[in-house]
Amino acid sequence: MEKMFSLRAHAAPVSGFCPWENQLVSADRSGTLIVWNLSTRRPAARFRAHEGQVLSMQPTRFGLLTHGRDSAVRIWPPGAAENSKGGDPHPIFEMPVNALNFCNVAYIDGADGTALLATPASVDSDCFDVYRLSPDFSLARAVENQAPKQEQRGADQIEEIGAPPGRGEGIIMRLAWAAPDLLYVGYESGALASFSLSPEGCRMLWLARAHSPHPVLSLALEGARVYSGSAAKTLLVHEPPHEEAVAKHNLGHYGVQCFEILPHLYLAGFWDGSVAGFSRDWQQLFSLERPHEQIEAPESPSRKSLCLFVWSAPAAPEQSRRDRLRSRRAAGRLLFVGHADGLIVAYAIDESSENGLLES
């Protein structure tokens, strides 16, 4: 299995990807965003979005939402990438958030043109807030400092000696919307909680601790199912309204830090930098390893993979034959893997192949 191509422009470790305006955007730990032309494999635009690592990126109806370690959430307007050629563009919206941990923020479209934004709480990192964002960018806090019900803690849980009483499930690690009225939250303790939002308020539906004591690192949704990866080798599958996991899988590597779901394939990235593909019946199909391209000095940045993203090429408008030939390189699904030395490697995903990746 061979890689398709590499993208080289980041001077810091790659921290994430997302699609925006039919282009691929990558972010790094310096706060830089790069918009890529996948036909030429070169940056189409580049700008500094944050003073520190970009933790979250998501396209929205308002523009590109980014969230950084500089304790800010910003929204960049459509066309910001083009405008960046004359200098860094200006966000059309900005709000402060709690970024004491590395938790993401989660956005989802709501009713009447509004949107919901879940963030770590302003007061406590083990709680969350939910804001309602209006089309005019006015904010209203819908949920404040929400934590799991303390009575849900089991008698069999062991507290550390000297730990403050009632500290709950530890800091929030991951947030994921399933619907505008359903939010999943992963905790440092290994707990996964489901919350229901309504005009009457927010209430916890269930809380499961099958990952404990290993922190939740990743959340992914497929229909009614929620997949959660932890600092251990375990990936759990929950199917509401059941509190207990309906499936538990040992993926063979510690730290399931990212997880992607395809119709025929599961993809997982781990702390050791490896990326593995699994069939829908959880047989490992392949493991991606980055080849050594040159002799490296001991002080060189780590080559470990840090994040992955599946890109689906947008429907192309009418093109000339020459343009069609150039864009064929970027056609279909591509798996992008971001590395700690700033390199991005792309692999072609073959929808008809049993092993999931295109063989050369």
UniProtKB/Swiss-Prot annotation:
Mitochondrion in keyword set: no
InterPro entries: WD40/YVTN_repeat-like_dom_sf, WD40_repeat_dom_sf
GO biological process: chromatin organization
Listed SUPFAM superfamilies: WD40 repeat-like
Keywords in alphabetical order: Chromatin regulator, Nucleus, Repeat, WD repeat
The WD repeat ranges on this chain: 9-46, 49-86, 167-205, 317-357
Transmembrane segments: none
GO cellular component: nucleus
Presence of keyword NAD: no
Subcellular location: Nucleus
Recorded superkingdom: Eukaryota
Major subcellular location class: nucleus
Subunit architecture: Component of the ASTRA chromatin remodeling machinery complex.
Function text: Component of the ASTRA complex involved in chromatin remodeling.
Family of the protein in this entry: Belongs to the WD repeat ASA1 family.
Name this protein carries in UniProt: ASTRA-associated protein 1
Organism: Clavispora lusitaniae (strain ATCC 42720) (Yeast)
